[in-house]
């Protein structure tokens, strides 16, 4: 691989300038080095990185005990890897984050250390690290494309030089190259000499000789083979040309360097391999990935400007099924966790009237002096009161006299129970309309003047419009359901269906808003039961990650819907479903054993956004102020969830987003970066890996719950005008970056 790249450690200064063909990146291992180009000198201290680009003049001068290392890529190697490699120009700036500098230095230190060790796997490891280094530079080091560099004033001469660098080993002629650029031979020869100070043949031979020197130094190939593979017609022609340029024969040149081998070249001056490896170890950190699997690059420039847009946070309504489930300490703990993380303050419970009617009509009579038929209900109410939760109760089949009487008994008891404490925030929710509701609401409002009424709204509601109008003064919210899975047949591959499904929730929301407008109904909306595309979750769980799709829906709904509903956990949700299709109508926050599902973290991250919108587009929103802001980036790809199971379809894609936030006030900022994607926070991905035929034991459960969290990175950065972030986005992933400027000292 020495024809492709060089790995060197230098302990001695360069006496003269050289012009680089290719790309060089390195860092100071120890001491101090001065890196010179045509116009400037850069002082580099221990750990500092330097980059020298194609055709740059350079020289380095090492101070006492100074050591540098570098990797030099040949242009032919780069041209095989990148389009327009000869125009690629890397430059480290203030926008290059400390994290990225550390990672570059880490990769180089590993690469040089591996090269010095020179064991049986060194070559393979070297090649992996070289690719990692180039990938990291492409993704994280600012770069531009220079079609004209200072060495050449004429673009066509530049093209000829690039062509020679890539094809020096072929039979090249002035005639061929003049045809390549569309000039006559004489004109090209004249322009070439004017620009470079040497003729075409001299430049071609110089290029060939420089490459031949590498082969003589680092390979055992015969001189004849080296001559032929570097563009010379014979060994004799090569020997004559080589002696003309170096004043030595190829054999003499190789004989003067018998002691230099691939691993010994690094141990120049007074340093042994072991000492160099110990010095390099100071720069080596753990690496998560060997090869970056980036498939797409995206560049985003953001400048804040005043907007009239506001982001509204949701009131979260958590369904728990039967009220008595609130007596379960695990469920209580889950509710309190939700309350802490994203301000959940409302619980929706099933109708308790059938339970009360059963007790009231029991064959034996409860002795009111020694028993309380509402004992368990009171304990549930106490929990809600203690933690400031509101209670919404779903009334169902309330058109009988027995039901209405039981309702009045229940409401009266609740009013008495809470009268000596603080008012319970109490709401009623009905999915069907009946005239008996008027009597019940009048009684309810007499005891709970601040109580609310939620009415389910759909097309069927229009048939009861007169009754709806009579109840309107008491109505606080209209409630609706929307399930994207209803819009598609998962056994088909019709893209139009999946496109329609991606808009299903927002389209139904807009339909109901229009319905309310037509009938002059002005109340906020609650989306109670809803879901994005999932398919059969028993199959797709752990494979189809959809956090970005959920966050996309929340952002679209934030100005249209006041409340969002979730089931508390998997067991409660499943126990109240008739079948799998019914289960697909809603989303739960927790799985079994208190494992938090990605939707939980989606709600948590969304809750970190503030109301003032500074910037927004199809995949990004920024909220806050210019000194304390939150950046939310997400990917939302709507496709058949079953395709996530097919490795041949490869629906998982990775995008690198280069994000610049411009015109920031200079200063030190704190960065908190949350990543939620299939690799970070996806519960079922880990669940499947640790599940056995006998289930999961406590150790496995605890481990999965500990590891199923979004990744968090925290660091400080000194910003001058621009914050540059490089974000690796996996399909349907979410990134939230909190940025806060420290006060000036």
Curated annotation (Swiss-Prot):
Entry keyword Transcription: yes
GO molecular-function terms, A-Z: DNA-binding transcription factor activity; sequence-specific DNA binding
DNA-binding region range list: 175-196, 223-246
Superkingdom classification of source: Bacteria
Assigned keywords, A-Z: DNA-binding, Repeat, Transcription, Transcription regulation
Domain HTH araC/xylS-type: 158-256
Protein's name in the database: Uncharacterized HTH-type transcriptional regulator SA0097
């Amino acid at each position: 691989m020495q024809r492709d790249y060089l790995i060197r450690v230098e302990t001695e200064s360069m006496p003269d300038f050289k012009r680089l063909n290719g790309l060089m990146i390195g860092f100071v291992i120890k001491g101090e080095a001065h890196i010179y180009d045509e116009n400037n000198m850069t002082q580099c201290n221990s750990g500092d990185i330097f980059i020298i680009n194609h055709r740059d003049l350079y020289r380095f001068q090492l101070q006492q005990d100074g050591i540098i290392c570098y990797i030099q890529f040949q242009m032919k190697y780069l041209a095989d890897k990148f389009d327009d490699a000869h125009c690629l120009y890397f430059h480290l700036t203030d926008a290059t984050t400390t994290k990225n500098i550390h990672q570059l230095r880490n990769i180089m230190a590993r690469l040089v250390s591996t090269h010095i060790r020179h064991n049986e796997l060194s070559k393979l490891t070297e090649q992996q690290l070289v690719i990692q280094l180039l990938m990291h530079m492409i993704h994280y080091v600012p770069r531009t494309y220079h079609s004209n560099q200072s060495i050449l004033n004429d673009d066509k001469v530049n093209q000829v030089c690039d062509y020679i660098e890539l094809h020096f080993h072929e039979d090249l002629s002035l005639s061929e190259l003049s045809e390549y650029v569309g000039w006559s031979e004489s004109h090209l020869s004249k322009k070439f000499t004017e620009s470079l100070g040497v003729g075409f043949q001299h430049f071609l031979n110089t290029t060939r000789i420089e490459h031949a020197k590498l082969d003589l130094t680092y390979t055992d190939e015969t001189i004849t083979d080296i001559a032929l593979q570097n563009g010379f017609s014979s060994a004799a022609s090569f020997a004559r040309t080589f002696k003309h340029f170096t004043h030595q024969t190829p054999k003499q040149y190789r004989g003067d360097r018998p002691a230099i081998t691939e691993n010994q070249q690094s141990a120049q001056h007074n340093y042994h391999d072991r000492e160099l490896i110990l010095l390099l170890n100071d720069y080596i950190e753990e690496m998560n990935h060997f090869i970056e699997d980036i498939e797409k690059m995206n560049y985003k420039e953001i400048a804040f400007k005043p907007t009239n847009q506001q982001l509204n946070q949701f009131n979260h309504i958590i369904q728990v099924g039967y009220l008595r489930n609130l007596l379960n300490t695990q469920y209580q703990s889950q509710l309190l966790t939700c309350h802490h993380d994203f301000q959940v303050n409302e619980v929706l419970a099933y109708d308790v009237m059938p339970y009360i009617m059963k007790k009231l009509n029991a064959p034996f009579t409860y002795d009111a002096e020694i028993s309380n038929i509402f004992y368990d209900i009171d304990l549930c109410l106490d929990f809600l009161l203690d933690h400031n939760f509101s209670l919404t109760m779903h009334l169902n089949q309330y058109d009988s006299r027995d039901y209405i009487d039981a309702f009045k008994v229940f409401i009266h008891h609740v009013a008495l129970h809470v009268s000596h404490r603080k008012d319970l925030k109490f709401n009623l929710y009905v999915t069907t309309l009946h005239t008996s509701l008027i009597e019940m609401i009048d009684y309810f409002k007499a005891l709970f003047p601040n109580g609310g009424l939620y009415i389910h709204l759909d097309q069927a509601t229009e048939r009861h419009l007169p009754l709806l109008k009579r109840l309107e003064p008491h109505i606080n919210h209209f409630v609706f359901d929307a399930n994207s899975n209803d819009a598609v047949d998962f056994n088909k591959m019709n893209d139009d269906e999946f496109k329609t499904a991606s808009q299903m929730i927002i389209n139904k929301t807009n339909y109901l808003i229009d319905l309310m407008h037509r009938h002059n109904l002005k109340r906020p909306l609650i989306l109670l039961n809803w879901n994005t595309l999932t398919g059969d979750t028993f199959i797709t769980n752990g494979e189809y990650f959809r956090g970005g799709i959920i966050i996309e829906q929340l952002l679209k709904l934030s100005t249209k819907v006041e409340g969002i509903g979730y089931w508390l956990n998997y067991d409660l949700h499943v126990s109240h479903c008739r079948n799998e299709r019914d289960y697909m109508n809603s989303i739960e926050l927790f799985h079994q054993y208190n494992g938090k599902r990605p939707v939980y973290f989606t709600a948590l991250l969304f809750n970190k956004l503030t109301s003032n919108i500074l910037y927004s587009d199809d995949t990004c929103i920024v909220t806050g102020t210019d000194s304390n802001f939150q950046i939310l980036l997400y990917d939302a790809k709507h496709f058949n969830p079953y395709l996530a199971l097919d490795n041949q379809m490869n629906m998982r894609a990775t995008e690198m987003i280069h994000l610049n936030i411009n015109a920031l006030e200079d200063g030190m900022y704190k960065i908190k970066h949350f990543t939620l994607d299939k690799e970070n926070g996806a519960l079922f991905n880990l669940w499947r890996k640790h599940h056995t035929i006998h289930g999961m034991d406590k150790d496995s459960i605890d481990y999965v719950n500990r590891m199923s969290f979004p990744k968090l990175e925290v660091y400080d950065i000194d910003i001058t005008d621009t914050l540059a972030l490089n974000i690796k986005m996996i399909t349907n992933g979410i990134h939230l970056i909190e940025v806060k400027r420290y006060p000036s000292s």
